[in-house]
Amino acid sequence: MRKIFYSVAGLLTLSGGVSITAQQAVVDTTNVYELNEVVVSAVQARRETPVAFRNVSAAELRENNTGQSLPYLFTQTPSVVVTSDGGNGVGYVSMRVRGTDAGRINFTVDGVPVNDSESHGVFWVNMPDFASSVESIQIQRGAGTSTNGAAAFGATVAMQTQRPRLEPYFEASSAAGSYGTFAHTVRGGTGLIGNHFVFDARYSNVQTDGYIERARANMSSYYASAAYYNGGTMIKFQTFGSSEVSYQAWNGVDSARLRTNRRYNSCGEYTDENGVKKFYDNQTDNYWQHHYHLLATQRLTDGLNLNVTLHYTDGRGYYEDYKARAKYAVYKLPNYTGADGKAQKRTDLVRRKWLQNDFYGALARLTYTRDRLQAVWGASINNYAGDHFGRVMWMKTVEAMPRPDYEYYRSRGEKLDYNTFLKASYRLSNALSAYADLQYRGINYSITGTDDKAGAIDVHRTFSFFNPKAGLSYERGGNHAYASFAVAHREPNRKNFTENGPSAQPTYETLYDYEAGYEYTGRAFHLGANLYYMDYDNQLVLTGKISEIGEPLTSNIKDSYRMGVELSGGVRLAPWLDWSGHVTLSSNKIRGFTEYVDTYDKDWNVLPQTVNELGTTDIAFSPNLTFGSTFDFHWRGFTAALMSSYVGRQYLDNTSARERSIDPYFLSDLRVGYAFHPHFMKEIALDVSVRNLFNAEYESGGWTYSSIQDGRRSTSSGYFAQATRNFMARLTLKF
């Protein structure tokens, strides 16, 4: 074990002051780092684990972190596609892996689930600049290893918060760029105090006007931790959270306007009494979220470690919007009779839709390493309680409003999620290892109250899942080959229940995942190939069918799959130049897909839906080809990187209709920087990024809706246009 002798004392405050009290200390840094690794060892894969994964280091995160949301730092990971509502990667963003949406990707921070328990999604607008407090991120593709929480149904993103830094430090970073984008971060730590204590803290603020009109965002976040180390003991408390206000840009841009004003934003649009088109200024999303983790790790014996984590998250917020010509009936109000004696069915109003929730639980992990065996036992229990309610804040017909802040719906969702797993890797020989992973997961979910669309809701469902995984791994010299089979299950989310109506309740989905791969690592190059076949049973998809309450119905389809090959590699072209890249070729299909289209007569009277049997079709938002390439130059403090990516055609629905699709696009980003180390501080670094270097006009997401009126089909589609060439410059000071 490496030991470091040093003199330290003092608290480095965020104002930059340092007070020093010298004392000799002997610190086993390897021991400190190993205790931190125990926290994530239960959910992160090791090299010999037979799954496809990529590790993103802290250095890579810091190098590319210039204010965009975290998924934009994954763009050079195989099979990852990202999109942004505002167009410039700040605020509301989302990611897909192998075409799998975020509601099917499991996200954890130090093993604690991050996915929303009800929607299964992750809202990165609530985690601005979280990359500045992350030590490493592992992105597993496919079913992956057993983890905690919902949505482990196609990919896993396991994040580890920053390791303790044993010497005092202070860093400040400011970035400014196109579309009024500013990102500021200060972070610091005490180093080791009294040979036992470490304190770290960060504060960040990110602001932007957005590429899309009015897609402004103002987001602040913080991270703070206090850790205690003593021999084989680690106790750490950490808290992180954020507040955000962002103007809505959820509607996208219709296809006609893409050619004339691709930055147009229809959110908040209304027409006043004089017939003048205006935009409601407070058409915003507002949210506050705070996470609290208490982690304890104890080395019980040589090779045996126990970790226990308690966690609590509270969140609250609302989005406010202007509703023109809203029906009184939707807001549980009678029609209004005006002074002229005529009944009015509609009015203009402003509403707020609220969510207040609490999420808390406990996790335990026991890791054992001895000779040929590595084993992990884990268990967790998590409880969620969330109140959904809506209020009318203003109404044009003031007399029709029953009371201020009139509440027109309220429901409560409660979810108990518990699991236990045992996974082990056993070395059968010097080169061959066997892997097994068994998980049981149980869910109790209820929704009661009233909904803004469905009226009364009364859902009570329980699920019990058994998720086995097994595989073999062979490693000799620089060669590594593996094969695995895994089963995963996913319960329906809140929307699947509330918008399907009482007589069309969905059931769970099942994934059978087959993976096989090969990697070679040499002195100057590495390459890898991974084959996958993901076979779905009862996958939930939109078919166009309308539920009995008039909402789009998500239906369980019996037969669908994703299969493909992922290639990756890298080479050192010169001592100062590296290249790395990846390619994914895939086929993503639904067998026997049936489309349902809303149908009307010439006078817009509702007719039965038109049914189209389309046979085998492509799964929406699943490009058949993606690739990425990075040239990385580094010489005497100078750095430069040229990063390129290509995303093939993505269909907006499951019909494989080219007219309802997103065109393929190719992007390149350039980053150049210089860092030097003056005698009075650790480092001064300046870098400049040019995003979308070749000024491509492209869209990365969207939606579509079709109807038939008097025998003619028409389609409305919205596309999320992304920023053309734009710039970002950053200055970083390290003390």
Regions found by a protein language model. Give the residues of each.
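Conserved C-terminal beta-signal and adjacent last beta-strands/turns
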Residues: 8-9, 240-243, 425, 483, ...
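Gram-negative outer-membrane beta-barrel transporters
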Residues: 430, 533-535, 555-654
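Extracytoplasmic beta-strand/coil segments of soluble accessory domains associated
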Residues: 71-113, 135
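Face-selective signature of the C-terminal outer-membrane beta-barrel domain
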Residues: 287-452, 473-477, 481-484, 525-531, ...
